């Protein structure tokens, strides 16, 4: 069964637990037309997309008072940071920023790429999720509405909703996936562990360690097991997926901890 058809016909599997959600825009002064078009798509006023409220059953209520405008396209971070830090965000409201970025996350210039990621970090520190929009893809693109379902699904997930889940019976299992990646700019190998607390694929958390931090990785896995057991009695099995064949030295801290 195609998940897209399921969400189109029946709506998302699980809505955001937040009862108060507010959107706000972050944009360059010259990108108001882009923001207006995105706004009209999100409200369902343009052909090709029914709007966020109808597609993911999430109320779309942009707060114009929180809108942030900046002038420097090359480095908007200082302007945005100043405005964000001077704002008083209601902690009882789940905020999501629609950032119309003048800088692509794949731009060759490293300093410009960092602007993209530092802004996301700044927002996350304020407990604000964000959805980035590339203005170059919006204005003159008559097919842009085909991108809206994916954007809407991403927004729902960032609001802690669940678009769909695996069609399998729920079991008391803890699944741990261990993967690796290399940061090409600094030449450092990292190991990451992603935890899924159910066999339905619902993601819970992610932690990252350097390649030689095998004991820290083991500790992370053991904490996940203990946290799971504390709220789920009768765990049936623990499944650990490794990205490679693990050496005895790497596996031993994990096995030793599980025995205790």
What are the functions of these language-model segments?
Residues 1-260:
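Long, low-complexity, intrinsically disordered terminal regions
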